[in-house]
Amino acid sequence: MKKQFITEGVKYMLISTFCFTVMQALIKYLPQDQISTIEQTFFRSFITTVFCLVFMLKNHITFAIKNVKLILIRSLIGTVSMFSFFYILPRMPLGSSVTIKYLSPVFTALFAVMMLKEKLKPLQWVYILIAFTGVMLLKGFDNRIAFTDLLIGLISAISGGLLYIILRQIGDDDHPFVVVFYFMLIASFISGLAMIPYWVTPDLKDSLVFLGVGFFGFVAQIYMTKAFQEKDDANYLAQFKYLEAAYAIIIGYLWFHESYTILSFLGIIFIFISLILTIRLKSKEKIKLTVEND
């Protein structure tokens, strides 16, 4: 019987990373001198909440939750991660901001060892290092990145890494739409209160952009939640977030005419090598386990 190399969790992550990149590009496209980061956070959260609400009502999905504490923690950490990332998006090239944020798989691997008691094989550490090297090559040491912005980006990466672990702990006890709905609802409430002093009414074009941000954010969030509720190891799935950096390099070049070097494309190759090796290692482990249990 032919074994499946690409799991459902991986498929969900591929969809999620692409949609997140489109959402980020739309945020960067907004007039940053007029619309504040906190207002961007509000519209992204609120519109996604509406999408979730409509879908849940249409499909008769219950609003009841089992892991109240974990979902609350997930929502608060997710809000911090989202705001800090939206803050750095307009302040540096798209590829650079996404690169910094998606150091989160490194933190996920560390949190997985500490919190989920998952064990990393020596080869997995090597593959993480290859991916990390690829991310660094994508933009190198960019002098356009301020130290303060770098720190805020790292906050987003660390909180994002912890976020995946919490989703793994929630598991499939709660429906993915329920998890996303309460995250977006809480984020809307927090950012809605905070944005009152900075409110600027968006025009028609900006409103349409916000609608796109909410839609792509909704799809990305759902598929990321579904991915981490699968049975794959958290550190395995998290490495696919590196693809987002590659997507961002391409979109940044085509849409925002951002300049990149040969090292950037070499970095993309490193990332794909890491992902392919990770998939092969995981597939071999599954085949071995199946044979041993036959």
Q: How would you name each of these model-derived features?
A:
Residues T17, T21-V22, L53, S75, ...:
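Hydrophobic/small/kink-forming positions within alpha-helical transmembrane segments
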Residues D33-V80, S159-L162, Y182-P197:
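Transmembrane alpha-helices of multi-pass small-molecule transport proteins
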Residues V98-L103, D174-F183, I222-Y253:
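Helix-helix packing/entry segments at the starts of transmembrane helices
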Residues L123-K139, L263-K282:
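Hydrophobic transmembrane alpha-helices of multi-pass small-molecule transport proteins
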